[in-house]
């Protein structure tokens, strides 16, 4: 927090902090933020005021009130939303006249951010050149050489992904949340989402087969009532299962994200699912899914 960035009141926030995700802040800083913001007082803005500025609605704030550490829960929930960053957090605290927090924690925040940047740079320097993570990933036919937005048109360096997302158009909002939680956070996974990543003009069945078998290490199936009516999803699921008989390679991961009126598909019942509808395990949902997708 120096003189080099946007100014809010008497506080100047370094511009680079707006590009850092909230995961850059370590446990110590978060605990100190809780000590400042958890107490309810009329003398200064508390965590509820911050939650409103972050865009959370009344019922969401009431849910945070039931948590032992509402500030921690608030930060965990906000860091998965678009627009969240270290810089934006500091900006909101300044707007709420909580400059006392900024002055108290500025050195520790700066230290966390610099450490995060160094770790990211180290990971990038140690990362090998992109190689095929799935055997035989080079397309065998020219028409499958340029099927995704970042593909080499000549087919020499095909775009690779951590997971193919099998979903119905009606479930796109949950898929977008998946993108925010898994790609735009510290997990930094790379998902293949057809509506975003696949170029038009090629047979959908050929594209799906190529991506699932040769470009993606896993496949996530977003199961819903509409999924059960989709011939395309049915093909993708059965094709993925055929590549891993008995699910020995943990290739396919079913997700149930909302209540269903119809029975869960029988071909997926023998696979452990990620259940977003279970309130008791919802807080672990994204961590479990991310770790499953990160397995070698």
From Swiss-Prot:
Lineage top rank: taxon: Eukaryota
Gene3D superfamilies: Death Domain, Fas, Toll/interleukin-1 receptor homology (TIR) domain
Span of domain Death: 32-109
Name of the molecule in the record: Myeloid differentiation primary response protein MyD88
Lineage of source species: Eukaryota, Metazoa, Chordata, Craniata, Vertebrata
Taxonomic source organism: Rattus norvegicus
Function: Adapter protein involved in the Toll-like receptor and IL-1 receptor signaling pathway in the innate immune response. Acts via IRAK1, IRAK2, IRF7 and TRAF6, leading to NF-kappa-B activation, cytokine secretion and the inflammatory response. Increases IL-8 transcription. Involved in IL-18-mediated signaling pathway. Activates IRF1 resulting in its rapid migration into the nucleus to mediate an efficient induction of IFN-beta, NOS2/INOS, and IL12A genes.
PTM annotation (Phosphoserine): residues: 244
InterPro entries reported in the protein's UniProt record: DEATH-like_dom_sf, Death_dom, MyD88_Death, Myelin_different_resp_MyD88, TIR_dom, Toll_tir_struct_dom_sf
Domain statement: The intermediate domain (ID) is required for the phosphorylation and activation of IRAK.
Keyword Disulfide bond tagged: no
Domain annotation TIR: ranges: 159-293
One Pfam short name: TIR_2
PROSITE patterns: DEATH_DOMAIN, TIR
SMART domains reported in the protein's UniProt record: DEATH, TIR
Predominant location: cytoplasm
Intermediate domain: annotated segments: 110-155
Gene: Myd88
């Amino acid at each position: 927090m120096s003189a080099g960035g946007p100014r809010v009141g008497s506080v100047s926030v370094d511009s680079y902090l707006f590009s850092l995700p909230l995961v850059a802040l370590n446990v110590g800083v978060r605990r100190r933020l809780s000590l400042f913001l958890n107490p309810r007082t009329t003398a200064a803005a508390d965590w509820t005021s911050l939650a409103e500025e972050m865009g959370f609605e009344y019922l969401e704030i009431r849910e945070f009130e039931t948590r032992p550490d509402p500030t921690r829960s608030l930060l965990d929930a906000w860091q998965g939303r678009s627009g969240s960053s270290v810089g934006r957090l500091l900006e909101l605290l300044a707007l709420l006249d909580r400059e006392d927090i900024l002055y108290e924690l500025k050195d520790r925040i700066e230290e966390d951010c610099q450490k995060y940047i160094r770790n990211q740079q180290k990971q990038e320097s140690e990362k090998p050149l992109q190689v095929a993570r799935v055997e035989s990933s080079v397309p065998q036919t020219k028409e499958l050489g340029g099927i995704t937005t970042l593909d080499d048109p000549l087919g020499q360096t095909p775009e690779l992904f951590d997971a193919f997302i099998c979903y119905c158009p009606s479930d796109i909002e949950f898929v977008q949340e998946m993108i925010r939680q898994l790609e735009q956070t510290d997990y930094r996974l790379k998902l293949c989402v057809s509506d975003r990543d696949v170029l038009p003009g090629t047979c959908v069945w050929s594209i799906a087969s190529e991506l699932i078998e040769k470009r993606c290490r896993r496949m996530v199936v977003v199961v819903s009532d509409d999924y059960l009516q989709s011939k395309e999803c049915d093909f993708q699921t059965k094709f993925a299962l055929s590549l891993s008989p008995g699910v020995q390679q943990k290739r396919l991961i079913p997700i149930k994200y909302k209540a269903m009126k119809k029975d869960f598909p029988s071909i997926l019942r023998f696979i452990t699912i990620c259940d977003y509808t279970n309130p008791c395990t919802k807080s672990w949902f994204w961590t479990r899914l991310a770790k499953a997708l990160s397995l070698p």
